[in-house]
A protein has these predicted regions:
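Non-heme Fe(II)/2-oxoglutarate
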Residues: 1-74
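Catalytic core of non-heme Fe(II) oxygenases with the double-stranded beta-helix
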Residues: 90-123
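Short helix-capping and hinge/turn segments at secondary-structure transitions, especially at repeat
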Residues: 71, 75-76, 113-117
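Conserved hydrophobic/aromatic beta-strand scaffold that supports enzyme active sites
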Residues: 12-14, 84, 107-111
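A short coil-to-beta-strand element that immediately follows conserved catalytic motifs
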Residues: 75-84
Length: 123
């Protein structure tokens, strides 16, 4: 089964290694450095004291860079709406949630960098 058919039939798609090692390292380093330097600590539950960023220029460029690859895999044209990233710290828990209902029909989740054990993403 090709990616586009799987996406149409199941409503999700896993695209392994969509970012190269060096680009992934660069984006991950940017996220951690931005969190360390800028802070932008959020108080929103359930993520108190966790750095979060909306419309970060590097992430906006990453979105534009990945768009053709994701459109090709999904077999459809997509309209990017927003970028948002958060740097989780030890002890943080990401509960089941829906990404901004009404603002996005499809979401992309990327693990850019990690320390310690793998933190699974459930669909």
């Amino acid at each position: 089964m090709n990616d586009a058919k799987f996406f149409k039939d199941n409503g999700y798609l896993i695209i392994p290694k969509i970012l190269s090692g060096e680009l992934l390292d660069f984006i991950g380093m940017h996220a951690f450095n931005r969190a360390k330097i800028d802070g932008n600590i959020t108080a929103e539950p359930p993520f108190p004291n966790t750095p979060a960023f909306y419309a970060d220029l590097t992430m906006e460029n990453l979105s534009a860079f990945l768009l053709p690859k994701i459109e090709s895999a999904a077999g459809m044209k997509l309209l990017p709406t927003y970028t948002y990233f958060r740097v989780y710290k030890p002890g943080d828990i990401l509960p089941k949630h829906t990404d901004r209902p009404g603002a996005c029909e499809f979401s992309i989740s990327l693990c850019l960098r990690k320390k310690g054990k793998i933190w699974p993403i459930f669909i």
